[in-house]
Amino acid sequence: MMGYFWALMSVLLVSGAQLMMKWAMVSLPPVGQTDALMSAFMSVTPGAVALVIGLFAYVFSMGCWYMALRRIALSKAYPLLSLSYVLVWAAAIGLPWLHEPFSVGKLAGVSVIFVGLLLVCLPDKKS
């Protein structure tokens, strides 16, 4: 059971990292504008903070993933990563500052991912 806890923590952290990185990339100046980008980091702007938090979330996610893989089979753990696609999509649609459009086609695709996850991760019925 702890393996699933660690896998879920990894998924939540990596999902949060994706959202923070997206927000940071929208908030920060382009990489080509070196002076403006450096100024954003030196001034500790919200975009720079979001970038650092996102990177740390990735690092902690890797630690959680390590703990998960020590406890559950890769064939069960790896499909759980697809839950991140579902969470990031739903959050991106729901968070107004990301300006992500909703579409029925994308909802269908995310639903297929979620159903596939259930099929892989639910216990097999023994006959």
UniProtKB/Swiss-Prot annotation:
| Membrane-spanning ranges | 1-21, 49-69, 78-98, 102-122
Q: Which UniProt keywords apply?
A: Cell inner membrane, Cell membrane, Lipid A biosynthesis, Lipid biosynthesis, Lipid metabolism, Lipopolysaccharide biosynthesis, Membrane, Transmembrane, Transmembrane helix, Transport
GO-annotated molecular function: carbohydrate derivative transmembrane transporter activity
Q: Which residues lie on this side of the membrane: Cytoplasmic?
A: 70-77, 123-127
Q: Which SUPFAM superfamilies match?
A: Multidrug resistance efflux transporter EmrE
Topology in the lipid bilayer is annotated as: Multi-pass membrane protein
Q: Which NCBIfam families match?
A: PRK02971.1-2 (NF002816)
Q: How does it assemble?
A: Heterodimer of ArnE and ArnF.
Q: Identify this protein by name.
A: Probable 4-amino-4-deoxy-L-arabinose-phosphoundecaprenol flippase subunit ArnF
Species for this entry = Enterobacter sp. (strain 638)
